[in-house]
């Protein structure tokens, strides 16, 4: 029925845009902390005929026939995730990290219940209670922040707010925090007020799987994550728990509460991702991610730029540009012109709008996948500072761009593109 025809032949306009993106990924340095390069095997799984299969329900209990093979696929993903993170319960069906969080809210809370989460400008996420998100619109969201001067999580404030507001759920986790989180302290505070503890480990899931960042699974009631970022899998989500007492509620919240049919081709890609993460070389990769981040942070600080919290113990750093009287939007543009991709990001007490900001966030998962070592990461940090110091000067930008071009050729992402 279907002709054996390529995208290029059938839809050349789309093919051109896709090819251009492949070129961009090969020729630009990727420093967005939430991005990474997945393996060809992960991409292959997402292009299979599993995409045709509807499979509402869970393995062994589907609402459609013909699910005997996709049951095997999903169970493989579940079992591997359990082994990887030491969890008793895993749901691999959420389409994203945000939908995983949404399902947890649906499972554990009633409308207008109080939740306590990290504010966006302190490094939290939209789904941790931001007023423009479902978590802030449908629930009474209280926000905690950082200790002024150190940039570390203000655990005393978390405890004080918890005692004052008696939240039904406390959220730990972040999208732009570069230090180690004290999961045990969050557990103590949650127990003190009788709250559920949800940990969103999306950014550090790979580091945790690799044993270079402490796991929240023994402490949290529920853990959510994406499967890309440091985990280096497909763009998707997952829910885990230390025991199965909440399994029925969580499963029902994902399906039918929050989603219909799962994406079986993506779940297959998750199974591959988890198998890759169980390999010995994955730990070596995660160790290098942190080493590269620390090498970059050292140079950036030596060049006079402030890193919120004073450094990094994970894969990312949030750089304040307030002292330089520079906006994140400007820095994003100037570095982009040099073929270095970052994202503008709010900093604590940011006077600028979220679309402008006073900071940038950078991370090392993608460059480490590419093969960068500490020396190359440190050199890259210097190039970033050269561009920012020049405020986007054309000559300085061109010089850095030529260096970027050279190292991208030296360290290709995918050999097939060379």
UniProtKB/Swiss-Prot annotation:
Its main location: cytoplasm. The record marks 228 as: Plays an important role in substrate specificity. Its EC number is 2.1.2.1. Keywords: Amino-acid biosynthesis, Cytoplasm, One-carbon metabolism, Pyridoxal phosphate, Transferase. Pfam families: SHMT. One of its GO terms (cellular component) is cytosol. GO terms for biological process: glycine biosynthetic process from serine; tetrahydrofolate interconversion. The modification N6-(pyridoxal phosphate)lysine is found at residue 229. It catalyses: (6R)-5,10-methylene-5,6,7,8-tetrahydrofolate + glycine + H2O = (6S)-5,6,7,8-tetrahydrofolate + L-serine. It is found in: Cytoplasm. NCBIfam families: PRK00011.1. This is Serine hydroxymethyltransferase.
């Amino acid at each position: 029925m279907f002709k054996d025809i390529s995208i290029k032949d059938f839809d050349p306009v789309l093919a051109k845009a896709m090819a251009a993106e492949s070129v961009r990924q090969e020729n630009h340095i990727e420093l967005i902390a939430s991005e990474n390069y997945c393996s060809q095997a992960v991409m292959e799984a997402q292009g299979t005929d599993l995409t045709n299969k509807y499979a509402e329900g869970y393995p062994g209990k589907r609402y459609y026939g013909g699910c005997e093979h996709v049951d095997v696929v999903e169970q493989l993903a579940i079992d591997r995730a359990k082994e990887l993170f030491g969890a008793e319960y895993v749901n691999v069906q959420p389409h994203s990290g945000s939908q995983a969080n949404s399902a947890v809210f649906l499972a554990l809370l009633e409308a207008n219940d109080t939740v306590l989460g990290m504010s966006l400008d302190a490094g939290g996420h939209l789904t941790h209670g931001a007023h423009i998100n479902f978590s802030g619109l449908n629930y009474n969201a209280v926000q905690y922040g950082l200790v002024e001067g150190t940039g570390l999580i203000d655990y005393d404030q978390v405890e004080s707010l918890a005692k004052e507001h008696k939240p039904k759920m406390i959220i730990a986790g972040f999208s732009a925090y570069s230090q180690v989180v004290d999961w045990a302290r969050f557990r103590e505070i949650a127990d003190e007020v009788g709250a559920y503890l949800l940990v969103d480990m999306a950014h550090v899931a790979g580091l945790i799987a690799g044993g270079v960042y402490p796991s929240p699974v023994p402490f949290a009631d529920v853990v959510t994550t994406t499967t890309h970022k440091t985990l280096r899998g497909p763009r998707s989500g997952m829910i885990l728990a230390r025991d199965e007492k909440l399994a029925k509620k969580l499963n029902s919240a994902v399906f039918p509460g929050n989603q219909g049919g799962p994406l079986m081709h993506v779940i297959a890609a998750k199974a591959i991702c988890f198998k890759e993460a169980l390999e010995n070389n994955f730990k070596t990769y995660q160790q290098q991610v942190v080493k590269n981040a620390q090498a970059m942070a050292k140079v950036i600080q030596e060049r006079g730029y402030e890193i919120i919290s004073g450094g990094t113990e994970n894969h990312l750093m949030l750089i304040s540009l307030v002292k330089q009287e520079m906006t994140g939007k400007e820095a994003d543009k100037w570095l982009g012109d040099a073929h270095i991709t970052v994202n503008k990001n709010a900093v604590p007490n940011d006077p600028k709008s979220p679309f402008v900001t006073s900071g940038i966030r950078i991370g090392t998962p993608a460059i480490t996948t590419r093969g960068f070592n500490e020396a190359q990461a440190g050199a890259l940090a210097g190039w970033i500072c050269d561009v920012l110091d020049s405020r986007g000067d054309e000559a300085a930008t061109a010089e850095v761009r030529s260096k970027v071009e050279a190292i991208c050729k030296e360290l290709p992402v995918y050999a097939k593109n060379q």
